[in-house]
Amino acid sequence: MTISPPEREAKKVKIVVDRNPVVTSFEKWAKPGHFSRTLAKGPTTTTWIWDLHADAHDFDSHTTDLEDISPKIFSAHFGQLGVILIWLSGMYFHGARFSNYEAWLSDPTHIKPSAQVVWPIVGQEILNGDVGGGFQGIQITSGFFQLWRASGITSELQLYSTAIGGLLLAAAMFFAGWFHYHKAAPKLEWFQNVESMMNHHLGGLLGLGSLGWAGHQIHVSLPVNKLLNAGVDPKEIPLPHEFLLNRDLMAQLYPSFAKGLTPFFTLNWAEYGDFLTFRGGLNPVTGGLWLSDTAHHHVAIAVLFLVAGHMYRTNWGIGHSMKEILEAHKGPFTGEGHKGLYEILTTSWHAQLAINLALFGSLSIVVAHHMYAMPPYPYLATDYGTQLSLFTHHMWIGGFCVVGAAAHAAIFMVRDYDPTNNYNNLLDRVIRHRDAIISHLNWVCIFLGFHSFGLYIHNDTMSALGRPQDMFSDTAIQLQPVFAQWIHKTHALAPGLTAPNALASTSPSWGGDVVAVGGKVAMMPISLGTADFLVHHIHAFTIHVTVLILLKGVLFARSSRLIPDKANLGFRFPCDGPGRGGTCQVSAWDHVFLGLFWMYNSISVVIFHFSWKMQSDVWGNVTAQGVSHITGGNFALSSNTINGWLRDFLWAQASQVIQSYGSALSAYGLIFLGAHFIWAFSLMFLFSGRGYWQELIESIVWAHNKLKVAPSIQPRALSITQGRAVGVAHYLLGGIATTWAFFLARIIAVG
């Protein structure tokens, strides 16, 4: 018999809470800055309001006790979920109360989605455009209509019911947030029981969550969509509970339902192949993924995660221990490997958050790319405005999450990292050879920058000199993306070779036939050429520069040759004195600030590339003569010069937003103008010196004193860090809103 050493013993799952730890009281709400001794005294200068905003959610600065911080974060998560559910409920309510959903459902190829009707105040009703079916409203591009159809919603009453359900759930979340902070707050020990947490999140959240969704897809979505696709009037379609209770009704659509669970228990699972399919490709009626494929996918995911939910060792002595896994993770060149990482991840929520943000951001970017190649919902692919919006939205979300990951990794380094617990493990080894990492990364950025832009500059020069035969293009000197083309080809051939059971490849974008719905292209093979090769190297360049800035911020967060005691100065500090050749803009916070601008560069190039490529090579109308694309295939011809991007993309496609005045799209014209102003306003904060403003303020205060109208709260210029924060916020807001107006006015007008 083997006796386990004590550290191998299972961590018993115990519910450990503090009863009534914090009194429920509104007193604190009446005292702004109650969390800080200095702020609670009230304002003496205008800096107070900025510090209040900067520190209100920085729980680390309120108390250093993790036992106190953890339930605060936990409780805040419930509040966050409550806010999300109220927002979601609002979306469903708009669908029920102000939308043309039922009309759209009856004719999704000709009627456009709208869920907002503007009141006739000072002529604003001009925004209510004709979206078809006799409905006037603002065309929406959020994809909710397509999502609702995919989930089997056939009436506005169902949307009302779901909206009310969302509000009830929100109330439950707000109650839980209050209860788990004021009545029964979990102890730190509970948050640190990672094996139990992994089992519950993997098995419960992802496993049972996917299983529940698969059940809904099979019992509600599939029958409803099958009837809708066959042209049955939504009002004639049975209600969801009828499909659930009446097996004969289901068996008419899916014969295997008549056999019940017999095939499941006799392991004759192929019987269920009529509703759990493995077709691949898109449904030619709707232009979306086969819903029977996505139901199959969710069943498979559920099985996978239900197994994963039993993987970690808790009350029974079987399964993995997270600490053991991490400490076993070492190779011949990695020193102590991941020893010490378990302690980091159970005591630093910043480290935990950094990893989650990095993964979540990457996932969002993966989602952006799947949404157009494999549109998951019916009639999504032919709604070009929604396709462009969803791609752009998921790219921005991904970019912000990745920068947030670097921010919290740097906060971890400054506030939570303990060098004594991390001797010669992988983290320590990375930090010790950070100079080699950063200098190599810097070299890569310089190489990529000069070479990728160099190719464009060469083309612009040759074009200006009238020497098209000397340009890099598909018709002159070719730089074909051979690896990408090979990947396309491999995936296009997969159904016959590597995926023998699939009837079609995962996406028509790899190759094959055009999928058209109602005469519009849903998806078709996307050919790659020299122009794509060029812009992909710009992507490589901008992404590497973003990583350089963010990684340098993390690796040099605690110390550098310039400022060895950086850790003592904190996460954000403006400068460290005038000596040493300049010590400003070196804090970890400043690296996040600078990284945001390069993240913005990266994402802008990606969404511009996507928008133009799709309009040029994919989106358009199918006629007897073939496919007529929106911009007629000009991407390959024009996008290989910088001048082409400026003239044939930005300028040519801005005509719709610039000329939108007096039409239903005029709001986009105003947003385009206003957002440019917000962007320009940011430059006032970014290109200015604090001393200039302080001097100006003091002369204005002098004038007020002369007139005896001086305020009791002394005005002060923004600190350097505050100015930069205001600057970057307006820069990003202005830039994103400008892009939004430009994209939507264009695609709604021509798409």
From Swiss-Prot:
P700 is a chlorophyll a/chlorophyll a' dimer, A0 is one or more chlorophyll a, A1 is one or both phylloquinones and FX is a shared 4Fe-4S iron-sulfur center. This is Photosystem I P700 chlorophyll a apoprotein A1. Its EC number is 1.97.1.12. It is an enzyme of class 1 (oxidoreductase). GO terms for biological process: photosynthesis. One of its GO terms (cellular component) is chloroplast thylakoid membrane. Gene3D superfamilies: Photosystem I PsaA/PsaB. Its main location: plastid. Belongs to the PsaA/PsaB family. The gene is psaA. It comes from the Eukaryota.
